C-alpha cells in the first residue's frame, strides 16, 4: 500500500470514528444508524464494515474506549496544574458547565449516553463503559491521594466526584440549564474539602 493510500485509509477510519462519536453523543447508540454514520463521515457505507467488521457493536466499543481516553486527558489537563484539589475540582465543574451550554445541552459525554442505553442489553459495551469510568476514578483517586486525601478515602472521593458530574450532565440536559452542573461542582468541592480535612 502506498503512503498516500495508507493515509487516505487511516483518514477514512478516523472520520467514521469521529462521526460515530458525535452521533452517539447527540442521538444515542440505538438512535443512530450505520447509514447516518457513513453519511456524516462522507464515507461509502461498505467502508464501515471494512474498518469495523463487527459492525455497530465494534464501532460502539471503540467510540467508548477512544472517547474515554480523550476525556481522561481533558480531566488531567484541567486538574493537574492545581496543587489545591478543592479549587481544581470546583474549576473542573465550572468548565463542564460551560461545555454543556456550548453544546446546546446535548450530552457532552458519549460514554454516559451509551452506558444508559445498553448496560442491561450488551455485555461488551457495558464492560467497556465500566472500564472507562473505572479509569477516570483511578486517575482521580491517585490525584486526590497525592494531594493529601488518605488512600482509603481517595477512591470513594473520586467515585463521588465522577457520579456527581455524570448525574449533573443528565439533569442539565433535562432542564436545559448548566445550573445542575454548577450545583454539583459546589457539592463535589465540599466532598474533597471534607476528605482532606479527615486526612
Where are these regions (language model features)?
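N-terminal intrinsically disordered/low-complexity leader segments
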Residues: 1-11, 198-199
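Helix-turn-helix
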Residues: 2, 15, 19-62
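Hydrophobic alpha-helical connector segments
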Residues: 62, 75-107, 157-161
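All-alpha amphipathic helical-bundle segments outside canonical DNA-binding/catalytic cores
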Residues: 87, 127-128, 146-162, 179, ...
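Short secondary-structure transition hinges
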Residues: 90-142
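Amphipathic C-terminal alpha-helical segment
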Residues: 99, 120, 142, 162-180, ...
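Hydrophobic alpha-helical segments that form the core
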Residues: 107-113, 152-171, 183, 187-191
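Hydrophobic alpha-helical bundle segments that form small-molecule/ligand-binding pockets
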Residues: 121-123, 133-158, 195-199
Amino acid at each position: 500500500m502506498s503512503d498516500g493510500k495508507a493515509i487516505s485509509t487511516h483518514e477514512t477510519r478516523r472520520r467514521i470514528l469521529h462521526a460515530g462519536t458525535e452521533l452517539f453523543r447527540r442521538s444515542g447508540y440505538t438512535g443512530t444508524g450505520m447509514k447516518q454514520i457513513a453519511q456524516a463521515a462522507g464515507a461509502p457505507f461498505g467502508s464501515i464494515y471494512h474498518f469495523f467488521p463487527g459492525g455497530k457493536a465494534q464501532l460502539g466499543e471503540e467510540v467508548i474506549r477512544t472517547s474515554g481516553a480523550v476525556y481522561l486527558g481533558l480531566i488531567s489537563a484541567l486538574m493537574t496544574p492545581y496543587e489545591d484539589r478543592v479549587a481544581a475540582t470546583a474549576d473542573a465543574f465550572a468548565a463542564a458547565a460551560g461545555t454543556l451550554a456550548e453544546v446546546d445541552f446535548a450530552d457532552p459525554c458519549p460514554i454516559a449516553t451509551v452506558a444508559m442505553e445498553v448496560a442491561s442489553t450488551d455485555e461488551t459495551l457495558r464492560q467497556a463503559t465500566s472500564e472507562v469510568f473505572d479509569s477516570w476514578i483511578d486517575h482521580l483517586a491517585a490525584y486526590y491521594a497525592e494531594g493529601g486525601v488518605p488512600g482509603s478515602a481517595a477512591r470513594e472521593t473520586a467515585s463521588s466526584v465522577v457520579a456527581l458530574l455524570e448525574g449533573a450532565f443528565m439533569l442539565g440536559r433535562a432542564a436545559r440549564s448548566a445550573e445542575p452542573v454548577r450545583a454539583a461542582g459546589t457539592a463535589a468541592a465540599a466532598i474533597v474539602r471534607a476528605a482532606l480535612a479527615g486526612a
